Amino acid sequence: MNFETSRCATLQYCPDPYIQRFIETPAHFSWKESYYRSAMSQSTQTSEFLSPEVFQHIWDFLEQPICSVQPIELNFVDEPSENGATNKIEISMDCIRMQDSDLSDPMWPQYTNLGLLNSMDQQIQNGSSSTSPYNTDHAQNSVTAPSPYAQPSSTFDALSPSPAIPSNTDYPGPHSFDVSFQQSSTAKSATWTYSTELKKLYCQIAKTCPIQIKVMTPPPQGAVIRAMPVYKKAEHVTEVVKRCPNHELSREFNEGQIAPPSHLIRVEGNSHAQYVEDPITGRQSVLVPYEPPQVGTEFTTVLYNFMCNSSCVGGMNRRPILIIVTLETRDGQVLGRRCFEARICACPGRDRKADEDSIRKQQVSDSAKNGDGTKRPFRQNTHGIQMTSIKKRRSPDDELLYLPVRGRETYEMLLKIKESLELMQYLPQHTIETYRQQQQQQHQHLLQKQTSMQSQSSYGNSSPPLNKMNSMNKLPSVSQLINPQQRNALTPTTMPEGMGANIPMMGTHMPMAGDMNGLSPTQALPPPLSMPSTSHCTPPPPYPTDCSIVSFLARLGCSSCLDYFTTQGLTTIYQIEHYSMDDLASLKIPEQFRHAIWKGILDHRQLHDFSSPPHLLRTPSGASTVSVGSSETRGERVIDAVRFTLRQTISFPPRDEWNDFNFDMDSRRNKQQRIKEEGE
């Protein structure tokens, strides 16, 4: 900003002490300070919010940003006579944009919200760091769980204990990670088979078992697939699954192999496989790089071999194991997890069939015990004579009856009734009693609501006295009929010019005195306005849809006090929202219910106290205003800062020329002194 030179002595006047930072020319400061020194005198919190420390922190965190400055200058000079006193006002506005394409800093999301800048400044002053508030999309795409069995990459990582028990919970993750198997045979000659019913894999030792890996979205570059065996039962889960000493020390399956002899799981046909043993927990796993599926396929196939039988002594020793397959990043963060049980045996088809038959028999026996609850038939042998079991005569409730039905609609209705009656037999008695009590309460509530509607219509037809107009039949205002989110959008600070003419509420028919009294419970109000909210605050909680006195007292547990209100013509909560404790006492409400109703009225008032915050902050002198915004475009960090500066310069002539302009201050002082003496 250039200043014109004057032969007159210059005295700079600042209307606000906070503006004094802007009086010196930018040459007196560094480039950063000259553009980021700001002041706000609205409140202590506001001044701290835009303090130089905050801008310095933003500048440091942006490292080397790309800045663009758009200066706007306005000058006003009041010079009535030549070489006389002048009054010059200069207004400057700098629109500064800082942007950076680096999004690796986790603190960046804090600068994308205007309200969070204040909390950041407080955290800086307190010497503490705050966590970044991630939104839903960011959490789904970026937040990943750390690997519980990742190798430590530094001394610090090695000092932190790894979990001794890896998680076996299925987790599809952000990429919908899934593991499946091909169509398998149950023949005895099959080398492997998978039971979807038991979620269990049966395979022979050292035989190839293909596993299909599927993701909906491609994982990040360098992702790997890890396979790790763990014991299934809780008493064995802390032990590491390894091969038995017999197979580990044998030459069979070990000669010419890259995999260590103690590893149970091996990968076949992949030279990039890496066998890992955690130095802390000792758990063994195998890693292969993730490869996208080939053209025309949905899956990525990995060939695994299991190098020890489940029945080997010294190894698994007939203890069931689980295979945990995870999709991880190169630094060990888990992107997805799948788990299935495995059994390595000599005849997979036979063992699968035996296990499935055993499970089915167990399910049938359990259902029989839960169904009739009868004991086993009684058999008795005496003197060599075998007594046959006497079958119970089937009770009428166990008979199967058939009812011919005509029409699909009638059949489906009867089918629902049949299923409901059968399901009711499996419910405990206390659940049924609770359901019946709830139905009775709802029935009583409906009856009270109907009576209140009738009384409301009767009071609406008669005209109340003039002295009771403020307390009787007070209809809700238009702002109360509009839902709270739209009410925030219709505030004077956010409604654009000319918006009132386009509001549908003004053009539609609003139910007034007669319409509101005749409004039935099933009749809906006009549809809500679909107006975008310009407030950046969280919208208030929704108001209760039923604003009648009946529902209000029912929520407070004071339904017995309904008559005190209906006798005075009070049917909606809007008629009592401004009541005080004395007003409730005048209604002769018992004292034990009076405090509860008063608290409910206060809670109802708080729902109406939400308003959109001002978008323009001003200082008391109006001299300096700073607004900060932020935006993110195409993965870049952008911070917009606008600085307003007001400078007023008053120029006076030299002291020896003051007499020409009636600026003789000594004569003025003498005159005031003489007036003071005469007054005394």
Curated annotation (Swiss-Prot):
Induction: Induced by DNA damaging agents. Residues 610-680 are annotated as: Transactivation inhibition. May be sumoylated. Ubiquitinated. Polyubiquitination involves WWP1 and leads to proteasomal degradation of this protein. It is found in: Nucleus. One of its GO terms (molecular function) is sequence-specific DNA binding. Binds 1 zinc ion per subunit. Residues 351-360 have a biased composition (Basic and acidic residues). Residues 1-107 are annotated as: Transcription activation. Residues 123-157, 379-389 have a biased composition (Polar residues). Residues 352-388 are annotated as: Interaction with HIPK2. One of its GO terms (biological process) is regulation of epidermal cell division. Residues 170-362 bind DNA. Residues 541-607 form the SAM domain. Residues 437-463 have a biased composition (Low complexity). Keywords: Activator, Apoptosis, Developmental protein, DNA-binding, Isopeptide bond, Metal-binding, Notch signaling pathway, Nucleus, Transcription, Transcription regulation, Ubl conjugation, Zinc. There is a cross-link at K676 (Glycyl lysine isopeptide (Lys-Gly) (interchain with G-Cter in SUMO)). Binds DNA as a homotetramer. Isoform composition of the tetramer may determine transactivation activity. Interacts with HIPK2. Interacts with SSRP1, leading to stimulate coactivator activity. Interacts with PDS5A. Interacts (via activation domain) with NOC2L. Interacts with WWP1. Acts as a sequence specific DNA binding transcriptional activator or repressor. The isoforms contain a varying set of transactivation and auto-regulating transactivation inhibiting domains thus showing an isoform specific activity. May be required in conjunction with TP73/p73 for initiation of p53/TP53 dependent apoptosis in response to genotoxic insults and the presence of activated oncogenes. Involved in Notch signaling by probably inducing JAG1 and JAG2. Activates transcription of the p21 promoter. Activates RIPK4 transcription. Plays a role in the regulation of epithelial morphogenesis. The transactivation inhibitory domain (TID) can interact with, and inhibit the activity of the N-terminal transcriptional activation domain of TA*-type isoforms. Belongs to the p53 family. This is Tumor protein 63.
